[in-house]
Amino acid sequence: MAEFLIEPRIRGFISLTSHPAGCAKNIDLQIERIRSENLPMGQKNGLQNVLVIGSSTGYGLGAALTACFGYGANVLGVCFERKPEGEKPGSAGWYNSARASETAAQDNLIFQTINGDAFSDDIKTQTIESIKKEYGKIDLVIYSLAAPRRDDGQGNVWNSVLKPIDQRYEGKSFDLRKESITDISIEPATADEILGTQKVMGGEDWQEWIELLAEQKLLADGARTVAFSYIGPEITQALYRNGTIGEAKKHLENTAIALDKVLGQTSNNTTGTVGGAWISVNKAVVTQASSAIPVVGLYMSILFRLLNERNENESTCCLLYTSPSPRDLSTSRMPSSA
């Protein structure tokens, strides 16, 4: 293979380049950390087949790695990543997924990925067929999608925006390209922008996935599902939690309540788990999505420094084993309001 130099290329808040060796090393370190926990593997943990929608970066990746290399589950991930072409590197998520699959195969574990738009009917169909042929009924569905747009398959293309509601937002941001702190001003969202953001980042697609799996009889008795959310510090409330994304998160949380009422009616006689739906609210993490939020980059740089000083800065893979165990999740119900 010819050698070539990979240099960072930044556009806005997104790095257009990633380093294959660096991504592989990152996955290796996460797997090493997971294995050091000596988690219960096999049927006794109630996790046999796990579907992770949004599996290539962030908390979705962390959950997928922990399910596979920690609990020994068969993992099927869905993500939308760019493949490498010649001297043009692929996206970090593509290399993450490739390394995870390679390592799983070496350890006689299953970590497979379907690469495509998780919102689309085509990818949903491919996923269903893969589950039928290679997995069997799903015990746990992790929903971890963050996207700029969604084609709902009904002729509508929705776009998500990061904007305040009813008032202009003024604050600080970090320019990655110039490596400088800048002042920003963002006008309030329109009604259409609020709705579009809800359609992309809310719970509608999550519910479609669960209903499709149920319709195809691919949810195990006592199946559970988890989606991720974030609250953020006070300094970001006007833009984030009280803005367009916050409205979408409220929709996501209300979707969890609706799904919980349905899934909570089933239980697994072997493991004793009761089905359900949960929202997992987590700490800030560096992703393309979080990098898009003004102020958050500055906030995270301070937060991580303090957490590191206290030895409390957990990686995304810690999520599934520092939370209640897969079986213990059945004892906690989704609150009536979130």
Predicted regions and their residues:
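A glycine-rich helix->loop->beta "capping" turn
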Residues: 126-155
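The beta1-alpha1 cofactor-binding region of Rossmann-like NAD(H)/NADP(H)-dependent oxidoreductases
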Residues: 115-127
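Catalytic loop of short-chain dehydrogenase/reductase
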Residues: 163-265, 286-294
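Conserved small/polar residues in nucleotide/adenosyl-binding loops
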Residues: 321-328
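Canonical Rossmann dinucleotide-binding motif of NAD(H)/NADP(H)-dependent dehydrogenases/reductases
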Residues: 45-78
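Structural signature of the Rossmann-like NAD(P)-dependent dehydrogenase/reductase core
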Residues: 52-53, 143-144, 223-230, 278-281
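Class I SAM-dependent methyltransferase Rossmann-like catalytic core
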Residues: 5-35
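Glycine-rich phosphate-binding loop and adjoining beta1-alpha1-beta2 segment
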Residues: 79-110
